[in-house]
Amino acid sequence: MAEITAKLVKELREKSGAGVMDAKKALVETDGDIEKAIELLREKGMAKAAKKADRVAAEGLTGVYVNGNVAAVVEVNAETDFVAKNAQFVDLVNATAKVIAEGKPANNEEALALTMPSGETLEAAYVSATATIGEKISFRRFALIEKTDAQHFGAYQHNGGRIGVISVIEGGDDALAKQISMHIAAMKPTVLSYKELDEQFVKDELAQLNHVIDQDNESRAMVGKPALPHLKYGSKAQLTDAVVAQAEEDIKAELAAEGKPEKIWDKIIPGKMDRFMLDNTKVDQAYTLLAQVYIMDDSKTVEAYLESVNASVVEFARFEVGEGIEKAANDFENEVAATMAAALGQN
């Protein structure tokens, strides 16, 4: 029987990431053979990971890494926010972003086959992390963005890494690119332009906006306030030339009815048309970057501001931890509480 020394345990821990007791047990079971102990720990880790496979991991972090003209943003999930602050977990997220930016995989399957700094595949690294951390740790998604030498990356993380953004701009500089990414983090656009919005999506969102107006009108009626009108349009995509021309004619008719002299109409109509466009592009403002009011200059939209500095956004990616994941009611915290309650009930 080989002597299991503290030095041997330390060496195994450094190579495997296992805890002290797990490392010592593995060495005892393999008679001090480091390589066999690593394999044993890996097998046990896979078994532990398999037991946790059905758990919902909706917490975690994003990772952002820029490698020359290639940038990656990733989302890695854990079951609890507590683990998301664990140094091992943070290192795993950062290493994942780095190997993806350098490896440029086409999809998750290719990403999981990439080699991590430890020599493991990315997939094996997550199995090991699940075993050593004690929660389900999962690699969820990534986005890769490339730029030219003349373009600029804006890399930004917010709220302790729960939100990660990369943007690419043409013109401007790195500082402007970062400001655009900060805006994206705060305002949550999903696409660049109204041209990317699905027609049915716009109709559904417009219906929801009008439903909110109906609810507001019920409250207004209770206090004697006049009802607000429904929105006819929600996106610039719906504002055809005919619609815009009719809006201008309606404004002229309104000015005539008010007795405004025609010689001043040219000074009034542009402002009213701007208001018409603003009131009838609410869906664009919620979901498209260029239509949003720029948080660094609320007198302009993002599009107008960029035009004023001869810059444009080429592409962006925004990840927020847990978006789109339906967290089970019996999550990890509840599972722990239930286990403790059961244990107390047995005593």
From Swiss-Prot:
UniProt entry keywords in alphabetical sequence:
Cytoplasm, Elongation factor, Protein biosynthesis
- Tell me the domain of life: Bacteria
- Which InterPro entries does the UniProt entry name for this protein? EF-Ts_dimer_sf, Transl_elong_EFTs/EF1B, Transl_elong_EFTs/EF1B_dimer, Transl_elong_Ts_CS, UBA-like_sf
**Entry-linked Pfam families:** EF_TS
Please list where the region (Involved in Mg(2+) ion dislocation from EF-Tu) is annotated: 80-83
**GO cellular component annotations, sorted alphabetically?**
cytoplasm
- Where is the protein found, in the record's own terms? Cytoplasm
> What does it do?
Associates with the EF-Tu.GDP complex and induces the exchange of GDP to GTP. It remains bound to the aminoacyl-tRNA.EF-Tu.GTP complex up to the GTP hydrolysis stage on the ribosome.
Sorted alphabetically, which NCBIfam families does this protein's record hold? tsf
Q: Which PANTHER family match?
A: ELONGATION FACTOR TS, ELONGATION FACTOR TS, MITOCHONDRIAL
Supply the name of the protein. Elongation factor Ts
Originating species:
Streptococcus sanguinis (strain SK36)
